[in-house]
Swiss-Prot record:
Domain of life of the native organism: Bacteria
PANTHER family for this protein: 60S RIBOSOMAL PROTEIN L12, LARGE RIBOSOMAL SUBUNIT PROTEIN UL11M
Quaternary structure, from the entry: Part of the ribosomal stalk of the 50S ribosomal subunit. Interacts with L10 and the large rRNA to form the base of the stalk. L10 forms an elongated spine to which L12 dimers bind in a sequential fashion forming a multimeric L10(L12)X complex.
The protein's name in its UniProt record: Large ribosomal subunit protein uL11
Keyword Ribonucleoprotein: yes
Role, per record: Forms part of the ribosomal stalk which helps the ribosome interact with GTP-bound translation factors.
Keywords (A to Z) from UniProt: Methylation, Ribonucleoprotein, Ribosomal protein, RNA-binding, rRNA-binding
Family to which this protein belongs: Belongs to the universal ribosomal protein uL11 family.
PTM comment: One or more lysine residues are methylated.
HAMAP family: Ribosomal_uL11
Example of a GO MF term: structural constituent of ribosome
GO biological process: translation
Cleaved signal peptide residues: none
Amino acid sequence: MAKKVEKVVKLQIPAGKANPAPPVGPALGQAGVNIMGFCKEFNARTQEQAGLIIPVEISVYEDRSFTFITKTPPAPVLLKKAAGVEKGSGEPNKNKVATVTKDQVREIAQTKMPDLNAADEEAAMRIIEGTARSMGITVE
């Protein structure tokens, strides 16, 4: 029989940099998970994506064991990296902070495809373009 999921914890952690300090420690401590076990496994699984923030969904079972699924980095993080900016615009409709090409948007859409609710690559690109627009990044 399958183990019963007791709790699902969702976190966004920098790749390869999970440690027992907040926010990881308290979130997993409340669920009764072996924090160091999670940190070592997460860091090993994400070390090649260093510098990106990785969303992770941790399923905690009744017997205190856990499994976790890493997702693709959030679109704004990938857009900022592609555009070479630290943060988006405070007034995206007035101040444009950077420009990305259609090819960069296509690349981000292909990366994000497993996590996006899009039927095809064109729809995924439109989602990414909308995110860019709301950050003050123009798409050419």
